Amino acid sequence: MNLIINDKTASSSVGQTIGKAARLNHAHVGYVCGGHGLCQACYITVQEGADCLAPLTDVEKAFLSPRQIAAGGRIACQATIAKEGTVKVLSRPEEVRRMVFSNPFQLIGYAADMGKDTAQQIVPGVQNLIGRIQRGEMGGKDALGDMIESIQGAAGLVVEAIQQGPMALPIPFKEQIADLISKLPLPQIQLPSISLPQLPSISFPQLPFSLPKLPFSLPFLPQQPQATASLEKVTITVQPPAKD
């Protein structure tokens, strides 16, 4: 099975939902409600291989507008891979990211369409939710456990990314943000010059009296004679002994 999420290949198998495959591959597809189709955080657009997926579920028919369905919209936690082939999808966060850095003005119409779709599907969505609650599909420990598992999975991804460093966080346009920050001119901060105050000069007061002179004089110390030595010239004459 060849599953491509946001232009990145993800391992998957037949019978698996796209939402489950996205979680296992750490792909940027949201999930909060535990795969019950309530939050629609995992909304995706199928760009290729729609025939490889199972038909729309009742949950998708209730929460997706006709416009979204016609555009290839699916809820990843509900869209099951039915047969082998190539399926290429685009998540909503990635779609928004591409708009931000290609044509931000598209976001105005995109947000308006999202609001219109949500308002249009409020009644069918609530009816579907009530029906599932009445059938016992949304109650009990299983549903709560699914939600807790999803939240724990999301928290685990964040913790893992933090351990790898700030830039490993699953932010949809972190590379572009980092690039923009690196190009921002840093302000030049000039520290003010600090001059220390001049210390005042301190003069000690003059004594009001003078020291008296000594009434006696020290005795004269005679100089000791210096010892001198001289070497006089000495002449030594050696005479040979007299002959008999």
From Swiss-Prot:
Residues bound to [2Fe-2S] cluster: C33, C39, C42, C77
Localisation: Chlorosome
Named cofactor requirement(s): [2Fe-2S] cluster
PROSITE patterns per UniProt: 2FE2S_FER_2
MF terms in GO: 2 iron, 2 sulfur cluster binding; metal ion binding
Pfam families: Fer2
Record note on cofactor: Binds 1 [2Fe-2S] cluster per subunit.
Segments forming domain 2Fe-2S ferredoxin-type: 1-95
Any one GO BP annotation for this protein: photosynthesis
Keyword list, A-Z: 2Fe-2S, Chlorosome, Electron transport, Iron, Iron-sulfur, Metal-binding, Photosynthesis, Transport
Highest taxon of source: Bacteria
GO cellular component: chlorosome
Function: Could play a direct role in the oxidation or reduction of the quenching species formed in the chlorosome.
Protein name: Chlorosome protein I
Record organism: Chlorobaculum tepidum (strain ATCC 49652 / DSM 12025 / NBRC 103806 / TLS)
Gene that encodes it: csmI
